[in-house]
A protein has these predicted regions:
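SH3/SH3-like (including bacterial SH3b) beta-barrel domains
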Residues: 153-163, 231
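C-terminal motif of bacterial Sec signal peptides marking the signal peptidase cleavage site
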Residues: 14-16
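Gly/Pro-biased beta-strand-loop elements
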Residues: 174, 193-301
Length: 345
């Protein structure tokens, strides 16, 4: 079976998802057909060539508005202050076409996992820097904390770069204490110590996708109905992470898997071990980034449905803040380890 020839470059995903080409579907070997009109002594044999599926492009993707959550619904284009914001449907179609094409490959999927360094702090990469948060990062800006070390097949002593927690990868096999993987968002084959990789079920399909636009501060939920056809389940305002060292960070761009859910995600006050409050209906996709409802700060305990700040400017620490009822919708609707979160700009 022909493997995907190009992987997503999520630097391109800042504005749109790259269209993928070059994936075929392996079919059974061709079989001869005997002409019904031919005589037994002069049978003509026609050979049917193997069918090769043509990769989908953005133009092949059909989006149908079939909302399951219809509160605070935004229009395709809507005014914001002195400008116009929108849902970037062309970019979203490219992302969905990429996902469709991905799933025709016979790969087994896996996830990078190292939330709060639970699987051990990643070793230092060959070349690193210290960022404005005073944390070690590779030369591409991916922090060591909560990340996964990626080794070149030619050098398994010192990692070359880091992979983000929650990133979707294709499992290629195993060699010694390493898994060989091909991340969706990073080109090439990499070796990763087994402890940092969670293998998903062979039957895993990604039919639920959440697209977060940190440029226009909105969120779209989409569900696959059949090949090339996706239903839009919600179009809502959201608030993403802001760049404010040393505590608040931008929501990272890329494609991630929903890994964990908490009905109440407790958070701490900045620079303190004291509880600051909780965020309801939290679905975690990378590091400490969750899709969640409006935060509830102590001493309050009752949930808050909506905030005037939703859909305005980045305000979160890294999370994607939603109306609480919409966060509950995502919490109930998107199955863990079978749903994708794509962050674009």
């Amino acid at each position: 079976m022909k493997r995907l020839t190009g992987l997503i470059c999520f630097l391109c995903l800042l504005c749109s998802c790259r269209e993928e080409a070059g994936r075929g579907v392996e079919q059974p070997m061709s079989q001869p057909i005997v002409s019904e009109t031919a005589s037994p002594d002069s049978m003509e044999v026609e050979e049917i060539l193997p069918f090769e599926r043509k990769p989908l492009t953005a133009a092949d993707i059909i989006l149908a508005k079939e909302l399951l959550f219809d509160k605070y619904t935004l229009k395709d284009e809507y005014p914001y202050q002195d400008t116009v914001r929108s849902f970037k449907w062309d970019a979203i179609r490219k992302c969905l076409a990429f996902i469709e094409n991905l799933q025709y490959d016979a790969n087994r999927w896996a996830i990078f996992q190292n939330y709060k360094n639970v699987n051990r702090e990643a070793p230092l990469v060959r070349k690193y820097t210290q960022n404005v948060y005073r944390r070690i990062a590779d030369t591409l800006g991916v922090e060591r904390y909560q990340s996964v070390p990626l080794y070149l097949p030619s050098d398994t002593l010192v990692p070359e770069r880091y992979g983000r927690d929650g990133a979707l990868v294709s499992f290629l096999g195993e060699t010694g204490s390493f898994y060989r993987v091909s991340p969706v968002s990073i080109e090439g084959e990499w070796w990763v110590p087994r402890r940092y990789v969670k293998l998903l079920s062979d039957s895993t399909q990604f039919n639920h996708v959440v697209v977060v636009d940190r440029g226009d501060q909105n969120i779209a939920t989409l569900e696959r109905l059949e090949e090339g056809t996706w239903a839009i389940r919600g179009m809502n305002p959201a608030t993403t992470g802001m760049h404010r060292p040393p505590y608040a960070q931008e929501t990272p761009l890329g494609m991630f898997v929903v890994q964990q859910k908490k009905s109440r995600m407790v958070f701490l006050k900045d620079g303190s071990a004291a509880t600051g409050g909780y965020a309801p209906y939290a679905s975690r996709f990378t590091n400490g980034a969750y899709i969640h409802g409006v935060p509830v700060n102590v001493p309050r305990t009752a949930m808050i449905e909506y905030s005037w700040s939703l859909g305005t400017t980045p305000r979160s620490h890294m999370c994607v803040r939603n109306a609480t009822s919409h966060a509950k919708f995502v919490y109930d609707w998107a199955p863990t380890e079978r749903s994708l979160v794509i962050v674009i700009e």
